[in-house]
Amino acid sequence: MEKQCCSHPVICSLSTMYTFLLGAIFIALSSSRILLVKYSANEENKYDYLPTTANVCSELVKLVFCVLVSFCVIKKDHQSRNLKYASWKEFSNFMKWSIPAFLYFLDNLIVFYVLSYLQPAMAVIFSNFSIITTALLFRIVLKRRLNWIQWASLLILFLSIVALTAGTKTLQHNLAGHGFHHDAFFSPSNSCLLFRSECPRKDNCTAKEWTFPEAKWNTTARVFSHIRLGMGHVLIIVQCFISSMANIYNEKILKEGNQLAESIFIQNSKLYFFGILFNGLTLGLQRSNRDQIKNCGFFYGHNAFSVALIFVTAFQGLSVAFILKFLDNMFHVLMAQVTTVIITTVSVLVFDFRPSLEFFLEAPSVLLSIFIYNASKPQGPEYAPRQERIRDLSGNLWERSSGDGEELERLTKPKSDESDEDTF
């Protein structure tokens, strides 16, 4: 007997429409963000501005937006208790948000380094390593099981990325510039010009901090000498682990216990508060950052692309929060694969990216392994998602199923019977 997918076709169609809309928004913002980071750099693939200033501004935009919406939600629902932290338990729950905030702070900062060393197309291809890191963390942290087909697809994905690394030259001096000359929004003052002229002699230039010495690890390892492992590759592997940990932990505290009933805007306000704190501490504690801001101003070196990047990063972060709250991590990872196709196409057309024959043979293997991974989700009873029902503060009943992520569905009171458990 065929199982009915949904007892309310109108609600299901709206839910599907909202899901596709959220996915499309995330894809557009993620693609735009990568391109804007690349375009905001100068002809030498360095940043005239402090990338941390762009990050702290985007966190501020998100915080202001979420605080304003939170006040409207609190005023409407009379939930003033959400702003009180009278007990140590509530304070500790508040401090939990510092962990994903710190991880996102590192993730947002590393992306500037990565795009200084890698073409945008190569960066998004290698970022598929996050599939592996997410799966490993799901197994270790959330105790989620994978079947042997999924483990095999992850192995194929890993080998494809290694082969892709062996067939590419992605050192910084091989990167093609975008060819744009930026006009600064603010004319530098005399003190700023003096500071910029003296910084090479004092060895405290900000631009120097955004480059690493060329890695030479392969000179001693002859077995792996054909693998051109550069600093960009190492950074993006680190970024994949950090972003996976951030997203998994963020999804966990977004949905655990009573957090499920709390407004996403109130939750995000806590997250972005810590985001501003960590970025602000970086600007204040690092001497070179303090000196540049003191002599040249906070927005020195910013251009039209970096300003657009601030707002795109802000709204992209909000879209990720909605995905983690109402969908799951795997949906987020799948949508990133569409970004891979878009960025690769743009890189060929705009950034003078010339993929080799090996690239055309190996890149589809990456996407194919991802497809196999998601097409072979476990169906056995031992892999069945755990079902639980909870009530929010308004008395509405929610069903929560833990599988690849967290699928949430509101249950109507008169129809909360056994048939509801068959709803997907």
Swiss-Prot record:
The keyword DNA-binding does not apply. The modification Phosphoserine is found at residues 394, 416, 419. The chain crosses the membrane at residues 9-29, 54-74, 94-116, 120-142, 148-168, 229-249, 264-284, 304-324, 331-351, 355-375. Residues 1-8, 75-93, 143-147, 250-263, 325-330, 376-424 are cytoplasmic. Residues 395-424 are annotated as: Disordered. Keywords: Antiport, Glycoprotein, Golgi apparatus, Membrane, Phosphoprotein, Sugar transport, Transmembrane, Transmembrane helix, Transport. Glycans are attached at residue 204. Residues 408-417 have a biased composition (Basic and acidic residues). One of its GO terms (cellular component) is Golgi membrane. One of its GO terms (molecular function) is pyrimidine nucleotide-sugar transmembrane transporter activity. Residues 30-53, 117-119, 169-228, 285-303, 352-354 are lumenal. Probably forms homooligomers and heterooligomers with SLC35A1, SLC35A2, SLC35A3 and SLC35A4. Probable UDP-sugar:UMP transmembrane antiporter involved in UDP-alpha-D-glucuronate/UDP-GlcA, UDP-GlcNAc/UDP-N-acetyl-alpha-D-glucosamine and UDP-N-acetyl-alpha-D-galactosamine/UDP-GalNAc transport from the cytosol to the lumen of the Golgi. This is UDP-sugar transporter protein SLC35A5.
